């Protein structure tokens, strides 16, 4: 029906908000001129992003291992039957994937010369420093998906 309101459930919002916010932050980054890290700190910034994403992956992997280590507990069985664990494991997986993607993008960008930024020409739109657009999106997505997992873990701990 035309003009029908779109209503999202809290579960749907939970699933999509990291992607939507990351896209919004990326648009804002582009709107403010898509600044690159300073040339003297270029590789340090990219290395820090790769290192932070490796820490994220380690934290998320350890979190999943700890949860799986409690698989014989009654609480684990209840959480599994409720569907909470499969949802949480899916969110952990997406957070790990986004963090690994950020690390890979950071390493790839180290091969670009910060003194000669690359502009992307898409249709009739010229995006300065366009090679950083995916990096900014992945950086925001990595942080937002990690925050989502952390928030759900704290909600889980509040129930115990």
Predicted segments with their positions:
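Select subsegments of transmembrane alpha-helices in polytopic membrane proteins
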Residues: 15-22, 90-103
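Alpha-helical transmembrane segments and their immediate juxtamembrane interface regions
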Residues: 124-160
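Long, highly hydrophobic alpha-helical transmembrane signal-anchor segments
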Residues: 5-51
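Membrane-helix interface/capping segments
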Residues: 62-82
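Membrane-interface segments at loop-to-transmembrane junctions
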Residues: 5-9, 79-93
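Alpha-helical transmembrane segments
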Residues: 44-60, 136-139
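Alpha-helical transmembrane segments and their membrane-interface junctions
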Residues: 98-120
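Membrane-interface segments at the starts/ends of alpha-helical transmembrane spans
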Residues: 42-44, 49, 121-131
